[in-house]
Amino acid sequence: VQSEKGRSRRSPWNAQHQLAFNTRSGRMQQAWDDISIADLPIREDLKSLRAYGAPQFDVPVRLNVNENPYRPSQSLADRIAQTLSEVAMHANRYPDRDATGLRARLADYLAHDTGVIVDAGNVWAGNGSNEVLQQILQVFGGPGRTALASTPAYPMYDEYCRTTFTRLHTFPRTETFELDRDLAVSTIQALQPDVVFLTSPNNPTGTALALSDIQAILGVAPGMVIVDEAYAEFRRHGVASAVTLLPGSQRLIVTRTLSKAFKFAGGRVGYCACAAAVVDAIKLVRLPYHLSVFTQAAASVALDCRDEMLSQVELLKAERDRTVSWLRDLGFDVPDSDANFVMFGRFEDRHRIWTELLRSGVLIREAGPQGYLRVSIGTADEMTAFRGALLSAMDTCPPRSSS
């Protein structure tokens, strides 16, 4: 039992019942809250692992998980609430298992964003792009199959592969965190992976891929090529989306999310665009009624109000570009960013800097290669707080020369 302050205390019932009698086996067993995970018969490959997740602290400035810092307007929140109230009257029935209305809206949005006509049958949706990517690995990965990613990469790729028993191979990016096209092509030709992960913009570096790089990989990859575009709406002018390659690429899957630019992280909706046959394949592993009626309804309202939901994207892009310039002026190594975050370094002791910022009430992320940190782009006031906290922290731990 947990007290209000989070300290464990034993209830009177537990004090009197340290052991419970198992009537089926005739043996005494420990009370259910008197065991740890080490006492459970979990799979051997899980015993040394920790659950994935970013640190969570209640601080004034949270710039660690790449959320949109701007809330939906009150009028939009009221519209969502009204829609959910109407939907609740039918909550006794299962939702549309294929989320056809939501997928049609997502297809319409992709056409608006990229200029490519996408049909609802070319879109699949899930509880965040994490679920969609997991489903893709369940279909195209698995025991005896392999995947390939460039590093540094989104840590969840390793999780998707681990939980689907897919072997993950990696190859390094360049010193400036760009994709090495020649190395990517030669590695694919040598390993013949079933799945290739590409990320544009890349997390944690923020760097985007040229369409020519994606096309080169599509030309040699024997299996599926996934382009993770979680941050696509933040790309700079002239950076094209991989969605534009879909009409001529049967084995290309482009994943996106409403969690970032759409300021809908709490709604947990992600999606992918691909050939209709790929959608049919994903349906083979989806759980029944995986998207609740409330999720579908709220996300549909968000998409119907896309102009308002995306209204601060240009503001965040401008703040990002100012942050990149400011950090470079201080002497940091900062890759170009097409996302709503910036990676910067290098520090002899990045954890010390991270800790100093946290003491100042600013939470960022220890992400990327050793010596680097990542900051999400917040409001103007939040970024002012970040700059002040970083300058203060640098007095005690200056950056390491990149030479």
Descriptions of predicted regions:
Residues 3, 17-19:
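Cationic, low-complexity basic patches in intrinsically disordered or flexible, solvent-exposed regions
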Residues 10, 21-29, 352-360, 365-403:
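PLP-dependent enzyme catalytic core of the Aspartate aminotransferase-like
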Residues 29-128, 135:
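N-terminal small-domain helix-loop-helix segment of the aminotransferase-like
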Residues 58, 120, 335-341, 368-372:
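Short Gly/Ser/Thr- and Asp/Glu-enriched loop/turn motifs at secondary-structure junctions
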Residues 73, 251-328, 332-335:
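PLP-dependent aminotransferase class I/II
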Residues 89-220, 231-249, 253:
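Conserved core of the PLP fold type I
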Residues 316-317, 321, 325-360, 377:
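Conserved PLP-binding catalytic core of the aspartate aminotransferase-like
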